[in-house]
Amino acid sequence: MNCSVNMVGRFRKLLAIAVGALGMIAIASSSFAAAANRADSDAVVAEAEKLVMQAGQSNPPNIKLINAAMDKLRAAIRIDPRNDAAYVDLGFCYTVMRDGKTAVDMYRTATELNPSGNNFIELADIYLRVGDPEDALLAANAGIVKDPSNARLYNAKGLALNDLHRLGEAQEAWEKALRLDPNLKVAQANLDALNSGQTGRGSVGKHPPQPAGAMH
């Protein structure tokens, strides 16, 4: 009797080990598939960005190329629905197409998928472009929580505060940006404009372009 009980116990342990191993294999397989999907999706995003760069070589931008880029970005999202870079680039394309509402939706989705400092900079920027400094300030502050050493987030915060006519706070934000990055020329230009009395839309500059590899 004891022998039978022991055999049953060992069988159950072996079964549990086998089930656990299968689970680990399934997780590893799923992770591998997700990584492969992201790589394929990123490759399509890169193709789309080349089209956007080509579109920007004409003035006004070549809308046919922008539409082609948007088709590729949608394809990238179908491959990997969590590719935040595709949503960021779609937001840029909708901005070029002067569809601010949809652009905001794209940038907001990017922050939901990946709440990085850079994505919140993009969201703050589009809010500023559509004349919504309140939400721009919220986006900048959310980004600062995620990336407190990002000077460009403080520059975006300063822009939002400037548009809200909270000039003292805008000055503090730009000074903070310069402490974090003394070479952030746009923050210095914004601070100089504020100190010279040039306030309001059009007297301060947007955040600077992203590093090489980004679209804007």
Which ranges hold each PLM region?
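Short coil turns that delineate tetratricopeptide repeat
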Residues: R38, P81, N114-P115, P148, ...
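Terminal, low-structured helical/coil segments at or just beyond the last alpha-helical repeat
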Residues: R38-D40, Q171-H216
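Canonical tetratricopeptide repeat
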Residues: D89, E122-L123, A156, N190
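N-terminal leader/linker segments that initiate helical-solenoid repeat arrays
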Residues: S29-R74
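Helix-start (N-cap) detector for alpha-helical repeat units in TPR-like alpha-solenoids
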Residues: S41, D84-A85, G117-N118, A151-R152, ...
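A conserved position within tetratricopeptide repeats
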Residues: A55-G56, I77, T111, I144, ...
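Structural signature of tandem alpha-helical TPR/SEL1-like repeats
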Residues: N59-A75, V96-T109, V130-A142, L164-K176, ...
